[in-house]
């Protein structure tokens, strides 16, 4: 008996003088969980087992006394007993070794088969108490009727295939379990088919031989015969497999009808002899194999018994699967083991972690620590911007502050009182260089007289004498006299040292600079690099501050050292000033003059080109909608413009029809190059500023573009109808950018408008026309066309399509033109409304077809008289463009050798390969520019291919070969590309808004990062007792909060000291192994690598969980 009041199985078997297996068999019949002879059961369960075994022994005694009660039945059974014995003797040769444990009493079962089975009395106790003898006789008669061989014998291949011998025996075990079941339905249903004079199991296949497998032990059959004998109706269905079915023993077929579904073992022909009744009794075989006889009269209402509940193959799904596909599985293999695994998305794919916790990245460019150190350095050196008062007016008090900076001749001028001789003074002057560091610490009473006697040199050096005296502790009255004369002497000082003069001038210059210091809103970086001094001048800071900032970032620099663009951006960001590249600025500058000398005689007035610019969501497209009386903004993805839209609007001004060409540019920060191209070809820039938002970063960028293009600016203050709108505040912010309104005395036209309500739209257009009249815009329509490519894309039906803005001349269908390195012949032209044109004049935007490839947006085009001359120009440009493109690709992939090798050694060098396809060239530029801004310290983004057009099968093949992701922007997939992508498992993503595209790419880059391991606290326990077990020890603990889990991480603290960190290997409660113990309970804790427990120790339990890392700092 255990300490908790339970009884072991072997103790119970010893008390009952039985074998352990007999007690285990009884426990299993009673659904009492007992795995082995050492399992513990409660007293109530032990009493239940004892009662069951006593009842079983009584039944066997009663059955033996009734052996000779019915000679008629006995004579019938004798006829079938001999074949059974022969059968068993044949089977004994195939017995498995493990059958020996249960083969003690098989012989009595064969003998009891000769006993009469007809009496119904034993059935009442285990199966149903309500059955009468009349019902049982009816059952017997009904079961005896079907005498003929089963017509369903050819359907044997569709029957259930047992998995192994043990599973066949398990079917009989289930019958033994059902013998003690109180369900009446299991006994009453089989007689129902007798109404139609049909066999009880017409749908089941009836084997021609006994169903016992060849490996079934014979002794277990004898062991349980006494119990089977008292239940003849439940265990008799196997009798029906032979032709001798007239025997009155047929009532035993009541509950074992499912056994008729079991087929012969594959590969062995069925035996056609008379299978007797004696082999139907199930051996008491405890096994975990599935019970497959769940069909027949118990379909739908049967529940598997507790002994086989934990086996996954004991479910109805398992039986149905075997019926549909009679595939013999391996023993113990659960059905459905091979599950289809959905392929994970490539964009969210993570590499397997190679270590528990990756090292944290070292961020060199973090701006916070350098700023803190810079501030502390400013305090030490006294160079803070506020320290300008002691600089402008140097006073006599400044001289004593620097006694160390003395001229070489200042030392010997300190004369002692005994030096009255002029000759001694002269000798002292001659020896001054050798005795420069001579101690002159005695100041006598005759200093005043000496000062009056000496002239020139002594007067000039008096200030340094006084500074030395003031640097010492207070002196007698003579020092005070000297101090009083010091003021007079310093006022009379005629000249200062070179070092003092330089310092004074530097301090004055710094003070003056700090007095008028204003940080610029934005700095423009030229294409070449900047030196430290040039950057300091642009940022209006000292060069020492930039050197200091670079030093804290691990970069040693001098004032003449050149800095690359990334370093300049980092430093400028630290000082709060955005950086604009000069190449973007140059893109906005008008490079070519469209008018030639020959055009001056044929010039006419042309429509002005107006570019609408401004920050994102400030209402540019809505303003154009109000002008064109169209609804463009509502149809755009995300409500933002992502292309340059070119429109021509006809207005009535001063009773004349006037045309205006509008270019709508994107306001998103990614479309800087598009805005620059729009400014390059424009005549007037309309700057849209929201009255409720004010001047924003893209507003400043648009202003710089317009100034680079040298075009006039008209400001439209939009959204004046919204709450919180303040046009005056917008004018104030624009005045800080040197855009002063006319009503404030400036030259910039500012018009408050409301695009939604249409307020002041006519006034804005009138102002635009007035400004363009001053510009005197002219062009020559009688010449070959010249202009600029505004946008370009690849259409799957039309091929390469370019949006052209003709700036001079007339473009006609059939013209041969060269746009950068691309050759084209105009096959067709359409305007913004889709109307086909034969020719287009100056300032007219058209879409042209007929290019051999997609031209680059921003390139200038020119029409040539013949194709030969055009090809010559294009060939030279193509070679230059190839070299430039190759240089850009190499620069984008450039990684420092040291960082690359270090990352490769640590396995941290990760790459995300992308194939980018978009609708137009401008979108490609914008996305590539945005990808350059993503952090690339740990994950590199490699763009293998970027081109406008739809996704083709070639792109899919390239992605499959390189493991890349195809990213499409406002594009579609060609025919066959989708099928190829599915076949090669290539991830193809399509986006309509650039926000979402960049966000997903950043998430994919983060997915390649190894996750961080973070501690998650579980609970705490206090050690209250220690139990020694051999060489180790177990701590008896009380859970104070949370819980402790087995195999979790623990930290043992003794006071403030941590004495152990490791795994919790053993966790028990009341000598039972448990998975976890909650707060308020006691438990035993054991660690394999720690045994030095002490009372009062605190055990902290925690576990390590993974946390997704981000690219940000």
From Swiss-Prot:
Keywords: Cytoplasm, GTP-binding, Initiation factor, Nucleotide-binding, Protein biosynthesis. This is Translation initiation factor IF-2. Residues 639-643 are annotated as: G2. Residues 614-621 are annotated as: G1. The gene is infB. Residues 248-265 have a biased composition (Low complexity). Residues 754-756 are annotated as: G5. InterPro entries: EF-G-like_DII (IPR053905), IF2_II (IPR044145), IF2_N (IPR006847), P-loop_NTPase (IPR027417), Small_GTP-bd (IPR005225), T_Tr_GTP-bd_dom (IPR000795), TF_IF2_bacterial-like (IPR000178), TIF_IF2 (IPR015760). Residues 56-72, 129-139, 162-187, 194-205 have a biased composition (Polar residues). Residues 664-667 are annotated as: G3. Belongs to the TRAFAC class translation factor GTPase superfamily. Classic translation factor GTPase family. IF-2 subfamily. HAMAP family: IF_2_B. Residues 718-721 are annotated as: G4. GO terms for cellular component: cytosol. SUPFAM superfamilies: Initiation factor IF2/eIF5b, domain 3, P-loop containing nucleoside triphosphate hydrolases, Translation proteins. It comes from the Bacteria. Residues 605-777 form the tr-type G domain. Disulfide bonds: none annotated.
């Amino acid at each position: 008996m255990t300490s908790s009041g339970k009884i072991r199985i072997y103790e119970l078997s010893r008390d009952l003088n039985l074998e352990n297996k007999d007690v285990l068999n009884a426990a299993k019949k009673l659904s009492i969980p007992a795995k082995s002879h050492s399992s513990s059961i409660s007293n109530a369960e032990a009493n239940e087992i004892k009662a069951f075994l006593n009842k079983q022994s009584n039944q066997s005694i009663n059955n033996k006394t009734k052996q000779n009660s019915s000679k008629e039945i006995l004579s019938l059974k004798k006829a079938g007993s001999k074949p059974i014995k022969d059968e068993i003797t044949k089977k004994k040769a195939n017995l498995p070794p493990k059958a020996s444990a249960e083969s003690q009493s098989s012989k009595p079962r064969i003998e009891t088969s000769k006993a009469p089975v007809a009496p119904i009395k034993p059935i009442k106790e285990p199966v149903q108490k309500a059955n009468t003898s009349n019902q049982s006789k009816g059952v017997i008669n009904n079961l005896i009727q079907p005498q003929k061989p089963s017509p369903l014998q050819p359907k044997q291949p569709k029957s259930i295939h047992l998995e192994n011998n043990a599973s066949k025996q398990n079917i009989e075990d289930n019958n033994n379990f059902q013998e003690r079941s109180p369900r009446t339905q299991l006994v009453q249903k089989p007689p129902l088919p007798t109404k139609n004079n049909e066999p009880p199991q017409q749908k089941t296949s009836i084997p021609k031989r006994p169903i016992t497998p060849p490996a079934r032990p014979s002794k277990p059959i004898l062991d349980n015969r006494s119990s089977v004998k008292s239940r003849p109706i439940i265990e008799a269905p196997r009798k029906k497999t032979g032709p001798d079915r007239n025997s009155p023993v047929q009532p035993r077929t009541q509950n074992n009808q499912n056994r008729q579904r079991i087929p012969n073992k594959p590969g062995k022909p069925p035996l056609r002899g008379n299978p007797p009744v004696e082999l139907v009794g199930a051996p008491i075989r405890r096994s975990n194999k599935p019970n497959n006889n769940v069909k027949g009269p118990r379909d739908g209402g049967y529940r598997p018994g507790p002994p086989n509940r934990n086996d996954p193959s004991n479910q109805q799904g398992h039986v149905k699967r075997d019926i549909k596909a009679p595939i013999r599985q391996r023993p113990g293999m659960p059905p459905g083991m091979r599950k289809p695994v959905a392929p994970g998305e490539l964009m969210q794919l993570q590499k397997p972690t190679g270590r528990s916790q990756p090292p944290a990245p070292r961020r060199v460019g973090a701006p916070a620590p350098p700023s803190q150190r810079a501030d502390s350095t400013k305090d030490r050196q006294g160079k803070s911007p506020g320290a300008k008062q002691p600089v402008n007016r140097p006073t006599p008090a400044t001289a004593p502050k620097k006694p160390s900076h003395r001229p070489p001749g200042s030392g010997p001028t300190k004369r002692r009182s005994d030096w009255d001789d002029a000759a001694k003074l002269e000798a002292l002057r001659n020896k001054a260089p050798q005795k420069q560091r001579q101690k002159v610490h005695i100041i006598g009473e005759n200093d005043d007289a000496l000062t009056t006697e000496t002239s020139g040199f002594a007067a000039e050096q008096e200030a340094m004498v006084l500074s030395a005296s003031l640097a010492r502790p207070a002196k007698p009255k003579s020092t005070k006299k000297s101090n009083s004369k010091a003021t007079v002497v310093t006022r009379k000082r005629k000249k200062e040292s070179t070092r003092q003069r330089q310092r004074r001038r530097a301090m004055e210059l710094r003070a003056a600079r700090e007095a008028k210091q204003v940080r610029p809103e934005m700095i423009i970086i030229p294409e070449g690099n900047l030196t430290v001094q040039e950057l300091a001048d642009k940022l209006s800071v000292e060069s020492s501050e930039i050197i200091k900032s670079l030093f804290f970032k691990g970069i040693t620099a001098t004032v003449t050292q050149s800095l690359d663009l990334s370093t300049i951006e980092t430093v400028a960001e630290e000082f709060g000033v955005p950086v604009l590249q000069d190449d973007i600025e140059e893109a906005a500058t008008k490079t070519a003059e469209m008018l030639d000398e020959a055009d001056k005689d044929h010039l006419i007035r042309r429509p002005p080109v107006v570019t609408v610019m401004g920050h994102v969501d400030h209402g540019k497209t809505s303003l154009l909608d109000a002008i064109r009386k169209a609804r463009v903004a509502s149809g755009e993805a995300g409500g933002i413009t992502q292309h340059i839209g070119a429109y021509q609007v006809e207005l009535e001004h001063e009773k004349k029809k006037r045309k205006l060409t509008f270019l709508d540019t994107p306001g998103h920060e990614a479309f800087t190059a598009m805005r620059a191209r729009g400014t390059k070809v424009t005549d007037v820039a309309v700057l849209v500023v929201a009255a409720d938002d004010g001047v924003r970063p893209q507003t400043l960028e648009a202003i710089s573009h317009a100034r680079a293009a040298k075009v006039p600016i008209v400001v439209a203050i939009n959204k004046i109808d919204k709450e919180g709108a303040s046009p005056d505040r917008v004018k104030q912010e624009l005045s800080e950018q040197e855009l002063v309104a006319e009503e404030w005395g400036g030259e910039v036209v500012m018009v408050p408008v409301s695009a939604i309500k249409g307020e002041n739209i006519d006034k804005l257009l009138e102002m635009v026309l007035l400004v363009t009249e001053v510009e005197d815009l002219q062009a020559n329509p009688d010449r070959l066309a010249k202009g600029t490519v505004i946008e370009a894309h690849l259409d799957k039906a039309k091929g390469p399509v370019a949006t052209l803005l003709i700036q001079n001349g007339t473009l006609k269908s059939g013209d041969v033109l060269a746009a950068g390195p691309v050759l084209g012949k105009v096959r067709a032209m359409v305007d913004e409304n889709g109307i086909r044109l034969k020719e287009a004049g100056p300032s007219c935007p058209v879409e042209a077809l007929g290019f051999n490839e997609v031209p680059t947006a921003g390139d200038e085009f020119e029409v040539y008289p013949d194709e030969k001359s055009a090809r010559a120009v294009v060939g030279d440009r193509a070679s230059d463009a190839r070299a430039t493109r190759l240089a850009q690709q190499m620069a984008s992939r450039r990684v420092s050798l040291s960082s690359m090798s270090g990352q490769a050694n640590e396995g941290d060098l990760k790459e995300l390969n992308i194939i980018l396809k978009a609708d137009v060239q401008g979108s490609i530029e914008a996305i590539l520019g945005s990808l350059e801004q993503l952090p690339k310290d740990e994950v590199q983004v490699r763009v293998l291919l970027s081109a406008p057009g739809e996704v083709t099968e070639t792109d899919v093949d390239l992605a499959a070969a390189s493991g890349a992701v195809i990213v499409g922007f406002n594009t579609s997939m060609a025919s066959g590309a989708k099928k190829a992508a599915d076949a090669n498992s290539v991830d193809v993503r399509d986006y309509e808004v650039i926000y979402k595209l960049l966000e997903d790419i950043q998430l994919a880059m983060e997915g390649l990062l190894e996750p961080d391991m973070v501690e998650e606290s579980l609970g705490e326990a206090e050690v209250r007792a220690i139990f020694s077990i051999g060489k180790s020890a177990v701590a008896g603990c009380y859970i104070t909060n949370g819980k402790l889990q087995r195999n979790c991480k623990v930290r043992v603290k003794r006071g403030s000291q941590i004495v152990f960190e490791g795994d919790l290997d053993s966790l028990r409660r009341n000598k039972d192994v448990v998975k976890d113990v909650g707060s308020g309970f006691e438990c035993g804790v054991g660690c394999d690598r720690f045994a030095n427990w002490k009372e009062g120790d605190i055990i902290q339990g925690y576990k390590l969980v993974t946390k997704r890392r981000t690219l940000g700092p």
